[in-house]
Protein backbone atom coordinates (compact mmCIF):
# COMPACT_ATOMS: atom_id res chain seq x y z
CA UNK A 1 0.00 0.00 0.00
CA UNK A 2 2.91 2.36 0.72
CA UNK A 3 4.25 1.74 -2.78
CA UNK A 4 0.93 2.87 -4.23
CA UNK A 5 1.02 6.15 -2.31
CA UNK A 6 4.70 6.84 -3.00
CA UNK A 7 4.33 5.96 -6.66
CA UNK A 8 1.35 8.26 -7.05
CA UNK A 9 3.12 11.11 -5.24
CA UNK A 10 6.25 10.91 -7.38
CA UNK A 11 4.15 10.28 -10.47
CA UNK A 12 2.29 13.53 -9.90
CA UNK A 13 5.64 15.34 -9.69
CA UNK A 14 6.66 13.81 -13.03
CA UNK A 15 3.32 14.68 -14.62
CA UNK A 16 3.56 18.23 -13.33
CA UNK A 17 6.98 18.52 -14.99
CA UNK A 18 5.56 17.10 -18.25
CA UNK A 19 2.74 19.66 -18.24
CA UNK A 20 5.15 22.50 -17.47
CA UNK A 21 7.43 21.69 -20.39
CA UNK A 22 4.39 20.98 -22.61
CA UNK A 23 5.74 17.67 -23.87
CA UNK A 24 2.83 15.48 -24.98
CA UNK A 25 5.02 12.41 -25.52
CA UNK A 26 6.48 12.70 -22.03
CA UNK A 27 3.00 13.17 -20.57
CA UNK A 28 1.73 10.09 -22.41
CA UNK A 29 4.79 8.01 -21.45
CA UNK A 30 4.64 9.00 -17.78
CA UNK A 31 0.86 8.39 -17.74
CA UNK A 32 1.41 4.86 -19.06
CA UNK A 33 4.12 4.36 -16.46
CA UNK A 34 1.80 5.49 -13.68
CA UNK A 35 -1.06 3.30 -14.90
CA UNK A 36 1.25 0.29 -15.10
CA UNK A 37 2.87 0.89 -11.73
CA UNK A 38 -0.27 1.76 -9.78
CA UNK A 39 -2.21 -1.02 -11.53
CA UNK A 40 0.47 -3.52 -10.55
CA UNK A 41 0.60 -2.37 -6.93
CA UNK A 42 -3.19 -2.30 -6.56
CA UNK A 43 -3.51 -5.75 -8.14
CA UNK A 44 -0.80 -7.22 -5.92
CA UNK A 45 -2.12 -5.59 -2.75
CA UNK A 46 -5.69 -6.71 -3.50
CA UNK A 47 -4.64 -10.28 -4.28
CA UNK A 48 -2.41 -10.68 -1.24
CA UNK A 49 -4.95 -9.08 1.11
CA UNK A 50 -7.50 -11.84 0.47
CA UNK A 51 -7.81 -14.99 2.51
CA UNK A 52 -6.79 -18.15 0.62
CA UNK A 53 -10.40 -19.37 0.75
CA UNK A 54 -11.87 -16.26 -0.89
CA UNK A 55 -13.86 -16.93 -4.06
CA UNK A 56 -12.09 -13.88 -5.59
CA UNK A 57 -8.58 -15.22 -4.96
CA UNK A 58 -8.14 -16.92 -8.36
CA UNK A 59 -9.46 -13.93 -10.33
CA UNK A 60 -7.22 -11.51 -8.49
CA UNK A 61 -4.22 -13.80 -8.96
CA UNK A 62 -4.77 -13.58 -12.72
CA UNK A 63 -5.05 -9.79 -12.47
CA UNK A 64 -1.89 -9.69 -10.32
CA UNK A 65 0.08 -11.66 -12.92
CA UNK A 66 -1.28 -9.60 -15.84
CA UNK A 67 -0.45 -6.36 -14.06
CA UNK A 68 3.25 -7.27 -13.96
CA UNK A 69 3.24 -7.06 -17.77
CA UNK A 70 1.65 -3.59 -17.54
CA UNK A 71 4.22 -2.50 -14.98
CA UNK A 72 7.13 -3.55 -17.19
CA UNK A 73 5.63 -2.03 -20.36
CA UNK A 74 4.71 1.12 -18.45
CA UNK A 75 8.28 1.41 -17.18
CA UNK A 76 9.53 1.35 -20.75
CA UNK A 77 7.05 3.95 -22.02
CA UNK A 78 8.86 7.15 -20.96
CA UNK A 79 12.16 5.68 -22.15
CA UNK A 80 10.82 4.73 -25.57
CA UNK A 81 8.56 7.75 -26.15
CA UNK A 82 10.97 10.40 -24.86
CA UNK A 83 14.59 9.26 -24.70
CA UNK A 84 14.63 6.94 -27.72
CA UNK A 85 12.11 8.85 -29.86
CA UNK A 86 14.89 10.67 -31.71
CA UNK A 87 17.06 7.58 -32.16
CA UNK A 88 15.67 6.23 -35.41
CA UNK A 89 13.16 3.40 -35.12
CA UNK A 90 14.44 2.18 -31.74
CA UNK A 91 11.89 3.97 -29.56
CA UNK A 92 8.86 2.89 -31.53
CA UNK A 93 10.08 -0.67 -32.07
CA UNK A 94 10.79 -1.18 -28.38
CA UNK A 95 7.49 0.49 -27.41
CA UNK A 96 5.56 -1.78 -29.80
CA UNK A 97 7.43 -4.86 -28.58
CA UNK A 98 6.84 -4.36 -24.84
CA UNK A 99 3.18 -3.37 -25.24
CA UNK A 100 2.53 -6.29 -27.60
CA UNK A 101 4.07 -8.56 -24.95
CA UNK A 102 1.92 -6.87 -22.29
CA UNK A 103 -1.28 -7.42 -24.28
CA UNK A 104 -0.35 -11.03 -25.10
CA UNK A 105 0.73 -11.64 -21.51
CA UNK A 106 -2.52 -10.21 -20.18
CA UNK A 107 -4.57 -12.50 -22.43
CA UNK A 108 -2.41 -15.44 -21.35
CA UNK A 109 -2.72 -14.51 -17.66
CA UNK A 110 -6.51 -14.29 -17.82
CA UNK A 111 -6.65 -17.94 -18.81
CA UNK A 112 -6.29 -20.66 -16.21
CA UNK A 113 -2.84 -20.25 -14.65
CA UNK A 114 -0.67 -22.91 -13.15
CA UNK A 115 0.48 -21.99 -9.64
CA UNK A 116 3.90 -21.15 -11.08
CA UNK A 117 4.62 -20.59 -14.76
CA UNK A 118 8.22 -20.62 -15.97
CA UNK A 119 7.12 -19.31 -19.38
CA UNK A 120 5.48 -16.33 -17.70
CA UNK A 121 8.61 -15.65 -15.64
CA UNK A 122 10.81 -15.88 -18.75
CA UNK A 123 8.50 -13.46 -20.55
CA UNK A 124 8.80 -10.96 -17.70
CA UNK A 125 12.59 -11.25 -17.81
CA UNK A 126 12.68 -11.00 -21.61
CA UNK A 127 10.59 -7.85 -21.53
CA UNK A 128 12.74 -6.42 -18.75
CA UNK A 129 15.95 -7.04 -20.66
CA UNK A 130 14.66 -6.00 -24.08
CA UNK A 131 16.25 -2.56 -23.73
CA UNK A 132 19.59 -4.25 -24.33
CA UNK A 133 18.85 -4.39 -28.07
CA UNK A 134 18.76 -0.57 -28.05
CA UNK A 135 21.52 -0.04 -25.51
CA UNK A 136 23.85 1.86 -27.84
CA UNK A 137 21.13 4.32 -28.96
CA UNK A 138 20.09 4.69 -25.32
CA UNK A 139 23.64 5.62 -24.32
CA UNK A 140 23.59 8.23 -27.06
CA UNK A 141 20.19 9.62 -25.99
CA UNK A 142 20.47 10.04 -22.21
CA UNK A 143 22.94 10.86 -19.48
CA UNK A 144 25.01 8.05 -17.95
CA UNK A 145 23.20 8.55 -14.64
CA UNK A 146 19.88 7.83 -16.38
CA UNK A 147 21.34 4.66 -17.90
CA UNK A 148 22.47 3.63 -14.40
CA UNK A 149 18.89 4.00 -13.11
CA UNK A 150 17.55 2.00 -16.06
CA UNK A 151 20.11 -0.73 -15.39
CA UNK A 152 19.16 -0.72 -11.70
CA UNK A 153 15.50 -1.18 -12.66
CA UNK A 154 16.43 -4.10 -14.92
CA UNK A 155 18.50 -5.68 -12.15
CA UNK A 156 15.52 -5.36 -9.80
CA UNK A 157 13.16 -6.98 -12.33
CA UNK A 158 15.56 -9.89 -12.92
CA UNK A 159 16.30 -10.29 -9.20
CA UNK A 160 12.56 -10.35 -8.52
CA UNK A 161 12.09 -13.02 -11.17
CA UNK A 162 14.86 -15.15 -9.62
CA UNK A 163 13.26 -14.90 -6.19
CA UNK A 164 9.86 -15.64 -7.69
CA UNK A 165 11.25 -18.74 -9.39
CA UNK A 166 12.49 -19.99 -6.00
CA UNK A 167 8.88 -20.59 -4.99
CA UNK A 168 9.80 -23.70 -3.03
CA UNK A 169 12.18 -21.81 -0.76
CA UNK A 170 10.78 -20.55 2.50
CA UNK A 171 10.05 -16.80 2.48
CA UNK A 172 11.14 -16.38 -1.16
CA UNK A 173 7.75 -14.95 -2.15
CA UNK A 174 7.97 -12.42 0.68
CA UNK A 175 11.44 -11.36 -0.45
CA UNK A 176 10.14 -11.16 -4.04
CA UNK A 177 7.62 -8.54 -2.94
Protein language model annotation of sequence segments:
Residues 1-176:
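Multi-pass alpha-helical transmembrane bundles in non-GPCR membrane proteins
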Amino acid sequence: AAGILLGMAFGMVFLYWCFRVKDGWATFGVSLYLLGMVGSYVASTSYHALRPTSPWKERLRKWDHAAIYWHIAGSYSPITLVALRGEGPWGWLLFAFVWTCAIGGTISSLRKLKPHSNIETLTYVGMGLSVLVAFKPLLHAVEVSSVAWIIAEGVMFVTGAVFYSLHRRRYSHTVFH
